[in-house]
């Protein structure tokens, strides 16, 4: 396998942040620019390719391997499907809830794809990875040097920023051994007060950039109901142009850095600074008011 010229990128982000939606819309825009791309879904929900394939959920490598008895019994054509603009689509899958490690599917899938020539004739490979925790399995694309550029999907909400900081910590751990770098934060807007300024400040603290701010628009949900990307559903819309702009920024991005994660105290101080979290005095005042109400 010769993959030296392939741009291997990964989208990480906490569950529910819109990571898979953002990544698929961005990849669709890249494909429209003529790029040859494969998506490797690394989320147990197996929803990383459904907008590209116009389907509910793609059958995963791990599911088929369990049915057959071993991953060696699979054919590449069974798990690699072609979607919108000829984007190749694969879902690694995960075990039954409460049994085994979800990261195992990622390791199994990538090894299978490599051994069967799936990485040939590509410009980009995009890994869509669950990012609430960067455990051994979910860190596999980073740890093994597969994904070289990480884009973190976040918002101005505290838990999304907390997850982004944790992911940055995971990138730092493998930056020197695997060569992985942080490409930037993608702010998928939740309409939080001063959200652009907040994420730009977080990006500075993490030694990276806010590569793009994706505004909130109901057209995204309208497209998802039809299992389509916005680019396909409403190509002339303002939101489609936002994803095209993000895709162009990623394509041209050379600002790849080793992140500098911050402490929980620093993150909370940042939220206090932007008025999204009360300081100690406000906290104590709120507690006193609550106790007074209970005593009344």
Curated annotation (Swiss-Prot):
It catalyses: N2 + 8 reduced [2Fe-2S]-[ferredoxin] + 16 ATP + 16 H2O = H2 + 8 oxidized [2Fe-2S]-[ferredoxin] + 2 NH4(+) + 16 ADP + 16 phosphate + 6 H(+). NCBIfam families: nifH (TIGR01287). Binds 1 [4Fe-4S] cluster per dimer. Homodimer. This is Nitrogenase iron protein. Belongs to the NifH/BchL/ChlL family. ATP binds at residues 13-20. Its EC number is 1.18.6.1. It comes from the Bacteria. GO terms for molecular function: 4 iron, 4 sulfur cluster binding; ATP binding; metal ion binding; nitrogenase activity. Gene3D superfamilies: P-loop containing nucleotide triphosphate hydrolases. [4Fe-4S] cluster binds at residues 101, 135. The lineage of its organism: Bacteria, Bacillati, Cyanobacteriota, Cyanophyceae, Leptolyngbyales. The gene is nifH. InterPro entries: NifH/chlL_CS (IPR030655), NifH/frxC (IPR000392), Nitrogenase_Fe_NifH (IPR005977), P-loop_NTPase (IPR027417). It is an enzyme of class 1 (oxidoreductase). GO terms for biological process: nitrogen fixation.
């Amino acid at each position: 396998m010769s993959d030296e010229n392939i741009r291997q990128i990964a989208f990480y982000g906490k569950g529910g942040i819109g990571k898979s939606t953002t990544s698929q819309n961005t990849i669709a825009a890249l494909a429209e620019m003529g790029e040859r791309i494969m998506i490797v879904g690394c989320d147990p929900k197996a929803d990383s390719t459904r907008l590209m394939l116009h389907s509910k959920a793609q059958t995963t490598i791990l599911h088929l391997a369990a049915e057959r008895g071993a991953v060696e019994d699979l054919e590449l054509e069974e798990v690699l499907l072609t979607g919108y603009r000829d984007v190749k689509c694969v879902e690694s899958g995960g075990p039954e809830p409460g049994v085994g490690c979800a990261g195992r599917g990622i390791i199994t899938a990538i090894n299978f794809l490599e051994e069967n020539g799936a990485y040939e004739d590509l410009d980009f490979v995009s890994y869509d990875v669950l990012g609430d925790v960067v455990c051994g399995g979910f860190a596999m694309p980073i740890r093994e040097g597969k994904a070289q550029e990480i884009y973190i999907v976040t918002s101005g909400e505290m838990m999304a920023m907390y997850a982004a900081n944790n992911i940055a910590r995971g990138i730092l751990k493998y930056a020197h051994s695997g060569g992985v770098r942080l490409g930037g934060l993608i702010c998928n807007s939740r309409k939080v007060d001063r959200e652009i300024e907040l994420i730009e400040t977080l990006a500075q603290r993490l030694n990276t950039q806010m590569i793009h701010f994706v505004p909130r628009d109901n057209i995204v949900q309208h497209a998802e109901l039809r299992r389509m990307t916005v680019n396909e559903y409403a190509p002339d819309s303002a939101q489609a142009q936002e994803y095209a702009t993000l895709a162009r920024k990623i394509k041209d991005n050379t600002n790849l850095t080793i992140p500098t994660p911050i402490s929980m105290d620093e993150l909370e101080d940042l939220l206090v600074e932007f008025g999204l979290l009360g300081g100690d005095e406000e906290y104590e005042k709120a507690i006193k008011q609550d106790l007074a109400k209970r005593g009344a």
